[in-house]
Amino acid sequence: MQILLEDPTKAAQAQVLASQLNQTDYPQFALVFTPERLELRKLDEPKLGAVYVDFVEGAVAHRRKFGGGRGQSIAKAVGLKAGAMPTVVDATAGLGRDAFVLASLGCKVTLIERSPVVAALLQDGLMRAAQDPEIGPWVSERMRLLQGPAVDNLLALPERPDVIYLDPMFPHKQKSALVKKEMRVFQSLVGPDLDADALLPAALQMADKRVVVKRPDYAGWLNEHKPSMAIETKSNRFDVYVMAALAAG
């Protein structure tokens, strides 16, 4: 993994990151420190552009402001009914978009990301978000990141969260430019979640109230385990495994 500097003032950060990633062997990728952020670039396919985490501007910010609040499907799936404010572990954090939505609605969210490269992008995005005057205070309070295998981190949690959220990597059929770009970069970097079926038993063991699994509409149940209910959207489905009712706060 190459680490490139387009902003010389970030040399110290680059050195720390290089020492953290010294066991990762991805010659076709580079992590680039630009003046604005940390970016992941696929060197052999530069037309794919950069992948990075941005909670302050762009699509994620638009979704926070205009995405439907507690009426959106993910909020219903995790149980954000009137007064309930569950603690959530997102065990397959990726670029953190769903975790950010839940945090913006008031949940305390622990993000688990197995890829050290993706975790570095997430950490950079969280750090920049924490410095933003509008969202910084609650991002710092409600979002924390753990790096490592999801099952190991789930089983090592000091307290059982109310909800565990899973969105395992699944081959995408959609042809949208954004999905194609990010999924091509992601799947060539981290590959599919081959241990995805092992996630569900660990999540069911550790969640106090419910487990939510996000699936493409064409995918079967995770681990072939029938959910208590499903909430369907245009292209995805939230399979919900309910263990106990969520108390209103």
UniProtKB/Swiss-Prot annotation:
The lineage of its organism: Bacteria, Pseudomonadati, Pseudomonadota, Gammaproteobacteria, Aeromonadales. It catalyses: guanosine(1516) in 16S rRNA + S-adenosyl-L-methionine = N(2)-methylguanosine(1516) in 16S rRNA + S-adenosyl-L-homocysteine + H(+). It is found in: Cytoplasm. S-adenosyl-L-methionine binds at residues 97-98, 113-114, 167. Belongs to the methyltransferase superfamily. RsmJ family. GO terms for cellular component: cytoplasm. GO terms for molecular function: rRNA (guanine-N2-)-methyltransferase activity. Gene3D superfamilies: Vaccinia Virus protein VP39, YhiQ-like domain. Keywords: Cytoplasm, Methyltransferase, rRNA processing, S-adenosyl-L-methionine, Transferase. It holds the Pfam family SAM_MT. This is Ribosomal RNA small subunit methyltransferase J. Transmembrane segments: none annotated. InterPro entries: 16SrRNA_methylTrfase_J, SAM-dependent_MTases_sf. Its EC number is 2.1.1.242.
